[in-house]
Regions:
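Short aromatic/hydrophobic contact patches that present stacked aromatics
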Residues: 7, 59, 108
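Anionic, Ser/Thr-rich low-complexity intrinsically disordered regions
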Residues: 12, 16-21, 29, 59, ...
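Hydrophobic beta-strand-centered segment that forms part of the acyl-chain substrate-binding groove
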Residues: 35-86, 100, 104
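Catalytic strand-loop segment that frames the active site of acyl-thioester-processing enzymes
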Residues: 1-30, 34-35
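HotDog/MaoC-like acyl-thioester-processing domains
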Residues: 2-4, 37, 67-68, 79-142
């Protein structure tokens, strides 16, 4: 899979001249959307199938600040995959600082039908479940 790389923008900085903590969560979302697009599952496809995918939980641990114009690489991996929900891990590396780990975090998601009922991923979204399990196996083989 293609790596997700982006530059830190000036408007993302705070008064101290570093990237505001809330932007790391946005970057994680950008990387997640990019990963799903690469796997052939853009959000629009889920919506066309009648599913939504809310974020159930998000957390981020900050290790070292990122500054304006730094280039970051975000590596997304599958941490857990269950029948109803799955968790992704994000490792955010500052490539402008020699690839140093700047932050890491997780997001947990589920799928709901438009009427709000939960989806059993392994039964109702078998193709997606298999794709995600393949992603997990690729990580184990690295």
């Amino acid at each position: 899979m293609r790596q997700f790389i982006r530059k830190a923008r000036y408007y993302e900085t705070d008064q101290m001249g570093i990237i505001h903590h809330s932007n790391y969560i946005r970057w994680m979302e950008e990387a997640r959307i990019d990963m799903l697009n690469q796997l052939g599952y853009p959000y629009r496809r889920f919506e066309e199938l009648g599913y939504i995918s809310p974020v159930l939980h998000v957390e981020c641990e900050y290790k070292k600040s990122v500054k304006f114009d730094d280039e970051v690489k975000i590596v997304v991996s599958l941490k857990e995959f269950g029948r109803v929900k799955f968790t992704l891990r994000y490792d955010i590396y500052n490539m402008s600082e020699g690839g140093e780990l700047s932050a890491y975090g997780t997001t947990t998601h589920c799928f709901l039908k438009k009427d709000g009922r939960p989806v059993l991923i392994d039964k109702e979204m078998k193709e997606f479940a298999e794709t995600m399990k393949t992603l997990s196996m690729e990580k184990e083989n690295q």
